[in-house]
Regions:
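Short conserved loop adjoining the S-adenosyl-L-methionine
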Residues: 1
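Hydrophobic beta-strand segment of the Class I
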Residues: 5-6
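A short His-aromatic
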Residues: 9-13
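S-adenosyl-L-methionine-dependent methyltransferase catalytic module, highlighting the catalytic core
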Residues: 18-19, 23-26, 33-146
Length: 147
């Protein structure tokens, strides 16, 4: 077992966040720590999207949604701000093609997190939140495994 898990800008790319968090929890020592960094939508290309609800995250978990899930592709295409994409600028057509090939490139943000969703999800997974920081581009959470 590990003392800590660090995840920076990963969980939003996972189709089933609760399943991932519970797996990460399994590799943590009892009372091990996790540093979780998620994108803050106001500072990136997700700013036009609605925040994901805990009910949606729970539904993905209960339905055992896997990484081939394309449920969010239309929203990711329709509300993606091409001007805020970091790195090389791309056309809408390129964005659509990248999104369709998500299983290979893992570009899609399946979910848009906010403080409420983070707290609900981590509480469900039995993590104790020790600190939370909101920056323009990042939501930073430091928590502890409650096992």
């Amino acid at each position: 077992a590990y003392d800590a898990v660090v995840s920076s800008h990963c969980l939003e790319h996972v189709a089933n966040p609760i399943k991932a968090l519970l797996r990460w929890k399994q590799v943590l020592k009892s009372e091990g720590f996790m540093l979780l960094i998620l994108p803050h939508k106001i500072g990136n290309f997700d700013h036009k999207r609605n925040d994901t609800t805990f009910e949606h995250i729970m539904s993905d978990f209960k339905n055992d949604v896997d990484e081939n899930d394309d449920t969010h592709f239309k929203e990711f295409i329709d509300f993606f701000d091409l001007e805020k994409k970091p790195g090389k600028k791309i056309s809408l057509e390129e964005h659509i093609e990248i999104t369709k090939n998500n299983f290979k490139n893992r570009e899609v943000h399946h979910h848009v997190f906010n403080k409420k969703l983070i707290y609900e999800t981590l509480n469900y997974c039995d993590f104790e939140i020790l600190d939370y920081l909101e920056e323009k581009e990042d939501l930073i959470i430091f928590c502890k495994n409650k096992i």
